[in-house]
Amino acid sequence: MSESVLIVGTGPGLSTSLARLCFSKGLKVALASRNIEKLNDLKKEIKAETFICDASNVKDVSNLFKQTDKSIGTPNLVIYNASSRPKKNSVVELDPIETQKSINITCFGAFLVAQEAAKRMLKRKSGSIFFTGATAGVKGFANSSVFAMGKFGLRGLAQSLARELHPQGIHVAHFVIDGVINKESSGDYQTIHPDEIAKTYLQLHHQ
């Protein structure tokens, strides 16, 4: 019986590499994003299911999993790759409402997705829930307070869930991406190729 994967927060870079790799390994693929029009080419390429979802919205996430259950079956692997940071980073310039929205997407959305995934995976006592973190979740940098809050919270969520769910057969992992992922917006930075990162995710899922 083939496995399935749900990737939440799909865009260029790592999410696309993950989707392609999973498809090449025989997994059924579902992709979720606030803007699915940008996924049209990828959808056709790998025959993926695509769903509109604001990961910080309780109803959206609940509906996403119901739709995924019907289309590709309950996912064996769920990857939370959504994150957000405001345009302005200085603490005195940050808008509180935009700050809250960013934290909700980066951290609270991860909780909502993990909760729905765990409800399903616990029934069969297997599955993987993966979170994409960043160096900002380990070390807070100047002018990056909002991103740091979200990513620190994400790391704490992952650690707690790993201890709670591992005894029941569910694999929870948090990946710290310590560098800039190679994509069009990366500029001239030294970058990490997303295909190589994607291989690590799938290897860990199959351990």
Q: Where do the PLM segments sit?
A:
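A short, exposed helix-loop element centered on a Lys and neighboring polar residues
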Residues: A114-Q115, Q159
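Active-site loop of short-chain dehydrogenase/reductase
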Residues: E3, T74-P75, M121-G133, P167-I170
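Catalytic Tyr-X3-Lys loop
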Residues: V92-F111, F130, L154
